């Protein structure tokens, strides 16, 4: 095979050859974004800014909206501490994912394929694909609800229309990865702005907010209903596909592939994801705060559905466009999640199976598998069934989480894989504690959901 043949992009469905095992993740965009090796800190941070914001999208999807709305409506500001705690856990795990990708030059899926036997990898791949479909399911539902609220499009029609976003992703990818990142960041700014306006109008008590965010209430664990919502918030926080995604897209930066260059890249990539996840913290906290002010404080504690919140926000907050801002933010969230789910699906399929397929085929396949259940359930059971399907998608994501968290913490703790860039023992111990907490709470959420507890 000539050099030209080896580097030329291929659009057909095929399994990569053995000679391509060392090919980087997302090789068409790997090392395509220049980074300065010196200069003012802001220029260097700006060069690395992007992957963290793409990852943060998964922390604001419709599954998070549902739990935050319910938490604020039922329990006021009390669960803000849980949102803060879950966000700190996410910051740690995403930093580890970035470290793995930069230190080894492999994404999490490639690292799993190299380490585990084939049967284990097959199980991991199936679990990942189910998680991608579940994530896409939430995005289809969220986008369809937003289209209905804004334009009156029926849920079934809105769900079918979401297939068109496949072409948006392809257009942006063809223009360059930086354009894709810019699109995501622009939509994040829209989401942030919508909730900043609503927070300003709601005017919550700052002292109470800060106290609830940093001082936990014993009621969180003594009140079964509150504990159930708290587990739901944590369970919906760390998206398993985000760990695969982040370990890959940090490699789009053309940092020096030396130990010094990698250490520098880890520092800036971690800074990028930490700032982006603080934005996600604001959005999730804002959803809960607005819900608490508009619903909990006005006797509407039973509000749990997104469309209920839309109907009540404007009259309760006294701002005519409050409901519109809410729906616009939901639409932006759904569109954004589309981009990251597409990339994660490509990374997982190439990493585990070495199967390379055209981006348009990957997108339409994943989105098609998500649209079908939404259309069928909506046709048979109406909008209530769609809401239950949204909850079910979060349960599927919870089931997949162990298959991403455990290998990640195992790999970044391994000096044979990471060399001098392996995490220190103290960080490893903390990571295992965080992993254990998330796994236990997710399994409890799964049990409670299946058996009707809470």
UniProtKB/Swiss-Prot annotation:
- TM ranges: 45-65, 78-98, 122-142, 153-173, 182-202, 220-240, 275-295, 312-332, 368-388, 389-409, 426-446
Which portions of the sequence form the region Disordered? 1-21
Membrane protein topology class: Multi-pass membrane protein
Q: Name one GO molecular function term.
A: metal ion binding
Cellular component per GO, a single term: plasma membrane
Query: Mostly located where?
Result: membrane
For this protein, the record's PANTHER family field holds:
NATURAL RESISTANCE-ASSOCIATED MACROPHAGE PROTEIN 2, SOLUTE CARRIER PROTEIN FAMILY 11 MEMBER
The family this protein is said to belong to: Belongs to the NRAMP family.
What is this protein's function?
H(+)-stimulated, divalent metal cation uptake system.
Identification of the protein by name? Divalent metal cation transporter MntH
Its source organism is: Mesorhizobium japonicum (strain LMG 29417 / CECT 9101 / MAFF 303099)
């Amino acid at each position: 095979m000539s050099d030209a043949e080896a580097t030329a992009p291929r659009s057909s469905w095929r399994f990569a050859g053995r000679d391509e095992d060392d090919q980087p993740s997302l090789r068409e965009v790997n090392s395509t974004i220049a980074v300065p090796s010196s200069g003012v800190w802001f220029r260097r941070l700006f060069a690395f800014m992007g992957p963290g914001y793409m990852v943060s999208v998964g922390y604001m999807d419709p599954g998070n909206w549902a739990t935050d709305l319910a938490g604020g409506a039922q329990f006021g500001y009390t669960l803000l501490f849980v949102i803060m705690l879950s966000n700190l856990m996410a910051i740690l795990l995403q930093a580890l994912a970035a470290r793995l990708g930069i230190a080894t030059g492999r994404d999490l899926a490639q690292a799993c394929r190299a380490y585990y036997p084939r049967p284990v990898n097959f199980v991991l791949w199936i679990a990942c694909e189910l998680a991608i479909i579940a994530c896409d399911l939430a995005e289809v539902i969220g986008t369809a609800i937003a289209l209905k609220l804004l334009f009156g499009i029926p849920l079934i029609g809105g769900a079918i229309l979401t297939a068109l976003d496949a072409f948006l992703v392809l257009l942006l990818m063809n223009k360059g990865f930086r354009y894709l990142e810019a699109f995501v960041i622009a939509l994040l700014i829209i989401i942030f702005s919508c909730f900043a306006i609503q927070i300003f109008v709601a005017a919550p008590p700052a002292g109470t907010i800060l106290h609830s965010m940093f001082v936990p209430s014993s009621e969180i664990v003594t009140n079964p209903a509150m504990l159930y919502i708290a587990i739901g918030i944590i369970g919906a926080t760390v998206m398993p596909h985000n760990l695969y995604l982040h370990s890959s897209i940090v490699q789009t930066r053309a940092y020096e592939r030396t130990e010094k260059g990698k250490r520098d890249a880890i520092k800036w990539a971690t800074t990028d994801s930490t700032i982006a996840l603080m934005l996600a913290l604001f959005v999730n906290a804002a959803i809960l705060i607005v819900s608490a002010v508009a619903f909990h404080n006005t006797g509407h504690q039973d509000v749990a559905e997104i469309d209920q919140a839309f109907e009540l926000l404007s009259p309760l907050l006294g701002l005519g466009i409050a409901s519109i801002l809410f729906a616009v933010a939901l639409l932006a969230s759904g569109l954004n999640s589309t981009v990251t789910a597409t990339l994660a699906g490509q990374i997982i399929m190439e990493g585990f199976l070495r199967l390379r397929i055209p981006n348009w085929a990957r997108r339409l396949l994943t989105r098609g598998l998500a649209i079908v259940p939404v259309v069928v359930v909506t046709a048979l059971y109406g909008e209530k069934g769609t809401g239950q399907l949204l909850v079910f998608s979060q349960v599927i994501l919870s089931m997949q989480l162990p298959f991403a968290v455990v290998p990640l913490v195992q790999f970044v703790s391994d000096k044979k894989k990471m060399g001098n860039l392996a995490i220190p023992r103290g960080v490893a111990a903390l990571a295992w504690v965080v992993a254990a907490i998330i796994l236990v709470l997710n399994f409890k959420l799964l049990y409670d959901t299946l058996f009707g507890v809470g």
